A protein has these predicted regions:
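Internal intein/HINT superfamily modules and their associated LAGLIDADG
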Residues: 1-280
């Protein structure tokens, strides 16, 4: 016979809460404590803990603690990427843990694949044929209240595009990896060539909030910031001149082991053409 959790002593109730927070599934809790999954789910929801929906078992897994502490290149990079292009889905109106994900154009699928590998996700990569950016979209969406809470704690918020603020929980030795991830999500490395001459120039732009643009300018000690007149609360951080662009790329890439292939290849083009003491 199934037991009533509310009739259990407080110590057992706390053990159930702790078991769920340590990623024990509702099915495992049911077997261990003798309460039905539905009863456990309602108990946890009443305690403010979101639970998985449907039949109350987890279909896919990932490293739920990946963003708990930002202490490696990989974590700093992906936090920066999530700042730029990540999102959170809040399931506040029904049972179900919140979700987080990345959606990119298909020509950047390598980044989705790398993210999936970094967080050890078993979730499938899905395709969206809407072609809103001229090509198919690819996405990875994962569910975990623990991971979502850690992302929120690190500054990744729902609807963050207008309110994003500089990171406060990334140590100085890892900041350049964070910036590289942010660049891969919201930055552009552009190539310009005058029709009347052979000179090629490069520029870097980040599209973000005023607070983030100002932080980038102060952190990197170069570049300029200016507003996007057509989009509310949107600012650009811009770096021009081949040598300054090269300097910023060196800062982001010199000891890197993870990046978006498309932008890294553009950096290699810049490096091959202008190297250390060439260009303007």
């Amino acid at each position: 016979m199934a037991i009533s959790i509310n009739k259990l002593d407080e110590n057992i109730q706390n053990q159930i809460i702790e078991a769920y927070q340590n990623n024990m599934s509702l099915r495992e809790i049911e077997n261990h404590f003798g309460a039905t999954r539905n009863t456990v789910s309602k108990f946890l929801e009443n305690k403010g803990l979101k639970t998985t929906k449907g039949n109350h078992h987890r279909l896919y897994f990932h490293d739920f603690d990946f963003f708990e502490t930002i202490d490696t290149e990989e974590k700093a990079y992906w936090l920066g990427f999530m700042y730029a292009d990540g999102y959170i889905v809040n399931n506040e109106n029904h049972y179900g843990e919140d979700e987080f994900g990345l959606t990119l154009a298909e020509d950047s699928i390598d980044s989705i694949e790398k993210f999936k590998a970094s967080i050890k996700a078993t979730n499938p990569i899905r395709y969206d044929d809407s072609k809103s950016v001229g090509q198919r979209l690819v996405k990875l969406v994962c569910r975990s209240q623990k991971t979502v809470n850690d992302l929120i704690d690190k500054g990744v918020l729902k609807g963050k595009s207008l309110i994003l603020k500089p990171p406060t929980k990334v140590s100085q030795p890892l900041i350049h990896h964070f910036i590289r991830g942010f660049f891969d999500g919201d930055g552009s490395l552009m190539r310009y060539q005058n029709k009347n001459c052979k000179h090629i120039s490069f520029g870097i732009d980040f599209t973000t909030t005023y607070e983030m643009a100002k932080w980038l300018q102060e952190t990197l000690n170069m570049g300029s910031i200016f507003p996007e007149k057509r989009r509310e609360a949107t600012w650009y951080y811009s770096v021009g001149g081949n040598q300054q662009v090269l300097q910023l790329c060196h800062y982001m890439y010199d000891d890197a082991s993870i990046w978006m292939d498309r932008k890294y290849n553009r950096y290699k083009e810049l490096l091959e053409k202008y190297g250390e003491n060439q260009g303007t």
